[in-house]
């Protein structure tokens, strides 16, 4: 039985009912409907911290989903799980893949920047300031892209960019 049919939370049940109604009335292929069901089940598993189950659902959703925009969100969520698991290289790969399909995902740019900033901090701890600066410069580039897409957001990143003189704001 799909996970979305066994959850006990009222909000989750309501979402599932509405999603099922929409799936019946919106003209989509059976593959897209299955992809959405896997995506929805992946989101539910992810919200409960069941990352292995979420990944299984997301991988199946990516296999079935044909729309690049919808695939971008599936790939983004896979990136989130890899980030949570400390698998930063894999996370970056999935954020890149999401952005290839949808370049208007500021949260993907932000998460990539956070990973690069973290790696810069790690390089400092290892005594490698040259590598640290390269990571920080990369973080700055990603944050600039996130900020360009949503200028009112990422205030902490904007402050960091100002303090480190990596970007001047008007």
UniProtKB/Swiss-Prot annotation:
<dbReference type="InterPro" id="IPR011990">
    <property type="entry name" value="TPR-like_helical_dom_sf"/>
</dbReference>
<keyword id="KW-0793">Thylakoid</keyword>
<dbReference type="InterPro" id="IPR019734">
    <property type="entry name" value="TPR_rpt"/>
</dbReference>
<feature type="repeat" description="TPR 1">
    <location>
        <begin position="35"/>
        <end position="68"/>
    </location>
</feature>
<keyword id="KW-0934">Plastid</keyword>
<protein>
    <recommendedName>
        <fullName>Photosystem I assembly protein Ycf3</fullName>
    </recommendedName>
</protein>
<feature type="repeat" description="TPR 3">
    <location>
        <begin position="120"/>
        <end position="153"/>
    </location>
</feature>
<comment type="similarity">
    <text>Belongs to the Ycf3 family.</text>
</comment>
<dbReference type="InterPro" id="IPR022818">
    <property type="entry name" value="PSI_Ycf3_assembly"/>
</dbReference>
<keyword id="KW-0150">Chloroplast</keyword>
<dbReference type="InterPro" id="IPR051685">
    <property type="entry name" value="Ycf3/AcsC/BcsC/TPR_MFPF"/>
</dbReference>
<dbReference type="GO" id="GO:0009535">
    <property type="term" value="C:chloroplast thylakoid membrane"/>
</dbReference>
<keyword id="KW-0472">Membrane</keyword>
<dbReference type="Pfam" id="PF00515">
    <property type="entry name" value="TPR_1"/>
</dbReference>
<keyword id="KW-0602">Photosynthesis</keyword>
<keyword id="KW-0677">Repeat</keyword>
<feature type="repeat" description="TPR 2">
    <location>
        <begin position="72"/>
        <end position="105"/>
    </location>
</feature>
<dbReference type="GO" id="GO:0015979">
    <property type="term" value="P:photosynthesis"/>
</dbReference>
<keyword id="KW-0802">TPR repeat</keyword>
<comment type="function">
    <text>Essential for the assembly of the photosystem I (PSI) complex. May act as a chaperone-like factor to guide the assembly of the PSI subunits.</text>
</comment>
